[in-house]
């Protein structure tokens, strides 16, 4: 972040630097500040493709699932990648669409992608399907880790949407 701050001081009207700062802020769990930077980046002419997926994450962290999903859809139409698919699937699950979320994950699940399987368990837990989530965790994780994560998973459906996004993305 120090490097980016210096870059911003040297080139305060560089949209790409603002976009990078926005991405850094979202990963530092400061989504409101991230959205400010993304807005500045856009005003300065930075291409949205530089930050769509991270802006979607910032919006998810603020409980703005509809806006987040629009960002993810656009990001996926420009440059599909597994991480953005997982973010989009989680956002759908938070919005109460667990089956649609799992449908998006299906190619990764068939490829035995561990991140996708963990996310599938979270999707189910967010939607109150704790027995199914527990089965997945027990089948895909070492026993000690599974036992540590199950109590956490079974609380996900009690959180608000912003908290669910934060819990899933940052633990």
Provide a role label for each language-model segment:
Residues 10, 27-28, 44, 61-62, ...:
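Register position in tetratricopeptide repeats
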